[in-house]
């Protein structure tokens, strides 16, 4: 049946949000063109007709940036978009997280959601448009999606919450909060904040959810008019008789295995139970399909037992109380040649973070859809396979590593000193050495210690903690400092980072359909208690940033020049500035206001470069005496270089007190002589006098400090006769 174009509109934060269906991408299961202000995003949803032979839900979410959306042509030889940018990867994760919980357990059809950003209005977030567009595409399609969902950005200006703030408003806001959810509950939170109290964050989340409800009602109206009938799918379920058989066979052993306190020993005990059961069925020559069901049933039994222990008996796999943090240890300065290092260990999770300081020219250059062009504070997170005792390929960072790195960066950025206070580029690298849950939060703690060890004057130390949730019907248990098995088998991973004063970052992922205000409030308060405990421990290791930088860190010298002189320092095609860099070995960064940052590990090199720049921008002053070098000789006088690039003429009559016949009788090229500036004419030409200096010094009883072979007349030169 031919689809007709339909247009739906609603006002969001004073700007029209328009949804168009039925015209573009009609072969997808569902498609929606979202116009928010001048931002345009095409979102599509497509699903396979048959279930895939996998033991998970194969959902893929892609957020595709197109540089034509902001009128740019990609750089490089190829001149087309390549791998996704870091921001595109984070946006893909942002859309994936609220959508994924809203598919039925056992649904194994492959689903792909693609959002293409086609036009960007910086005041209207393309990520929000893509999130809403993805929900609309799924909701109006025949894919069995249990939505819709919606999301908004919440800012706070002068104590007032603002929905989807503009770029100008965002600069004044002390938080950047993204809230997504269904009409009944919140199922995704992502935030960066400037030490905002927990109770304010909670109110902001609930404020955002009210707008989410309005947007969901809008989507329900669209679905009622253009939505397709949902396809019938067969949800995967293991054989009930086989499940009862395996439960009888393995349940008692699984109950013992999951309560082994140490991670590796517990994993081994669980695997031994599973291996024994699988061996029994292999001996009976069970087919591949049956063995696959055996694996899934065993996993289900482990999950049920862990959840039962936590919710009913209030017992965690490692024996801790629900609000108890694992044993902590930390150290700083363990890598002697780095600028700063911090090691943070929490139970069997261990992260080593290293801080490197660089010149302002070391900033990361961004080529994306945002107005931002560079980044001077970076946090990178690496997760090698040995951290979980496994082998594996050592590739570049994946979506998870990029997401965890960005979360740490967002948590630490509010306490990083400004460029004026600390004119360095700062790069943090967090190496996960052991993993048993909460590595992203351990990286925040280790990075705080590394910056303090490096002497970065942070405003306050930051710590992070991951909260968990296990919910059965109306009963729930919130867990502090979740470990791997609790994250894997629980319902929530709620990461909270901040200082003693307040929250700097939040990230909430859940596997159930949503959370209520009460659960969020309890989780935030329990997280604060844990965060303060971790901060107390960290302060015992290093209570404040070191007063001095590492001797291996670059030293930065700041000077100011007249902005009109910048072109003289740079020179044609950068010739002058490159010459200074080659001569001294320093790095030089120049700002438009005339501020110059000179950086080098060698302080003497900084001073040398500064002197050269001062000479370049120095102005010749009438009446001043200079020690200059003779550069050129003419019949009428000598041209003398006063300092770098500045010269003047000493007329023959001004070279000596007595009358002379030739310039060469007094000076030669390369001589250093004292001269006085007598005049700068209308054309900018500088007139000099050596005679005036001689008179002044003779009157004072001093000899001129000149580098010459003789003073006064030179002997006549002998020439060979022809």
Swiss-Prot record:
Function text: Involved in mRNA degradation. Catalyzes the phosphorolysis of single-stranded polyribonucleotides processively in the 3'- to 5'-direction.
Record organism: Geobacillus thermodenitrificans (strain NG80-2)
InterPro entries referenced in this protein's UniProt entry, alphabetically: ExoRNase_PH_dom1, ExoRNase_PH_dom2, ExoRNase_PH_dom2_sf, KH_dom, KH_dom_type_1, KH_dom_type_1_sf, NA-bd_OB-fold, PNPase
Domain KH intervals: 554-613
Compartmental location: Cytoplasm
Keywords: Cytoplasm, Magnesium, Metal-binding, Nucleotidyltransferase, RNA-binding, Transferase
CDD domains associated with the record: KH-I_PNPase (cd02393), RNase_PH_PNPase_1 (cd11363), RNase_PH_PNPase_2 (cd11364), S1_PNPase (cd04472)
Cofactor: Mg(2+)
Stated name of the protein: Polyribonucleotide nucleotidyltransferase
């Amino acid at each position: 049946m031919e689809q007709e174009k339909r247009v739906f509109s609603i006002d969001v934060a004073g700007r029209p949000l328009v949804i168009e269906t039925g015209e573009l991408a009609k072969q997808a299961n569902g498609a929606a063109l979202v116009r928010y202000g001048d931002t345009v995003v095409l979102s599509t949803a497509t699903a396979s007709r048959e279930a895939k032979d996998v033991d998970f839900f194969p959902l893929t979410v892609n957020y595709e940036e197109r540089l034509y959306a902001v009128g740019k042509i990609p750089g490089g030889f190829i001149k087309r978009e390549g791998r996704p940018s870091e921001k595109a990867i984070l946006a893909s994760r942002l859309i994936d997280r609220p959508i994924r919980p809203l598919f039925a357990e056992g649904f194994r059809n492959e689903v792909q959601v693609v959002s293409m950003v086609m036009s960007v209005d910086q005041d209207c977030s393309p990520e929000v448009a893509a999130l809403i567009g993805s929900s609309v595409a799924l909701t109006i399609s025949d894919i069995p999606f249990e939505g819709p969902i919606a999301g908004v950005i919440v800012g706070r200006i002068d104590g007032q919450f603002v929905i989807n703030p503009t770029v100008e408003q965002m600069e004044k806001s002390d938080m950047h909060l993204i809230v997504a959810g269904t009409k009944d509950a919140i199922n995704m939170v992502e935030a960066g904040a400037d030490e905002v109290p927990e109770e304010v964050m909670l109110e902001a989340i609930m404020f955002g959810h009210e707008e989410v409800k309005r947007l969901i009602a809008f989507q329900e109206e669209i679905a009622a008019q253009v939505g397709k009938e949902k396809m019938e799918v067969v949800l995967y379920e293991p054989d009930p008789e086989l499940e009862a058989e395996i439960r009888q066979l393995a349940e008692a052993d699984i109950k013992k295995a999951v309560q082994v306190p140490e991670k590796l020993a517990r994993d081994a005990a669980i695997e031994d139970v599973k291996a024994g059961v699988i061996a029994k069925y292999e001996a009976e020559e069970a087919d591949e399909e049956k063995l696959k069901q055996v694996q899934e049933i065993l996993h289900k039994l482990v999950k049920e037992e862990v959840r039962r222990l936590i919710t009913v008996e209030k017992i965690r796999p490692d024996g801790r109380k629900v609000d108890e943090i694992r044993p902590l240890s930390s150290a700083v300065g363990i890598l002697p040649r780095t600028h700063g290092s911090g090691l943070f260990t929490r139970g069997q999770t261990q992260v080593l973070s290293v801080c490197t300081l660089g010149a302002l020219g070391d900033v990361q250059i961004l080529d994306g859809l945002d107005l931002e062009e560079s980044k001077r504070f970076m946090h990178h997170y690496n997760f090698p396979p040995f951290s979980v005792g496994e082998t594996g390929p050592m590739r570049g960072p994946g979506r998870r590593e990029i997401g965890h790195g960005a979360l740490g960066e967002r948590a630490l950025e509010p306490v990083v000193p400004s460029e004026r206070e600390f004119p360095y580029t700062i790069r943090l690298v967090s190496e996960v050495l052991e993993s048993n849950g909460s590595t992203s939060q351990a990286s925040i703690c280790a990075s705080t210690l590394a910056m303090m060890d490096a002497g970065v004057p942070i405003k306050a130390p930051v710590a992070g903690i991951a909260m968990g949730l296990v919910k059965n019907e109306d009963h729930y248990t919130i867990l502090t400092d979740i470990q791997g098995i609790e994250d894997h088998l629980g319902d929530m991973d709620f990461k909270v980072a901040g200082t003693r004063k307040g929250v700097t970052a939040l990230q909430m992922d859940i596997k159930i359909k949503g959370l209520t205000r009460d659960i969020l409030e309890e989780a935030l308060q329990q997280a604060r208690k844990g965060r303060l405990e971790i901060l107390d421990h960290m302060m015992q290791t290093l209570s404040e940033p070191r007063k001095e930088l590492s001797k291996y860190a670059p030293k930065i010298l700041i000077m100011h020049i007249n902005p009109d002189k910048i072109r003289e320092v740079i020179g044609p095609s950068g010739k002058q500035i490159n010459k200074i860099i080659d001569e001294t070995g320093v790095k030089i960064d120049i700002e438009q206001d005339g501020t110059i940052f000179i950086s080098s590990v060698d302080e003497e090199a900084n001073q040398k470069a500064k002197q050269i720049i001062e000479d370049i921008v120095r102005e010749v002053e009438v009446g001043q005496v200079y020690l200059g070098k003779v550069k050129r000789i003419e019949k009428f006088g000598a041209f003398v270089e006063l300092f770098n690039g500045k010269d003047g003429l000493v007329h023959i009559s001004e070279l000596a007190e007595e009358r002379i016949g030739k310039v060469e009788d007094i000076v030669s090229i390369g001589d250093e002589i004292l001269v006085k500036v007598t005049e700068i004419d209308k054309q900018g030409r500088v007139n000099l006098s050596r005679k005036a200096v001689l008179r002044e010094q003779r009157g004072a009883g001093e000899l001129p400090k000149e580098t010459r072979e003789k003073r006064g007349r030179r002997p006549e030169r002998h020439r060979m006769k022809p």
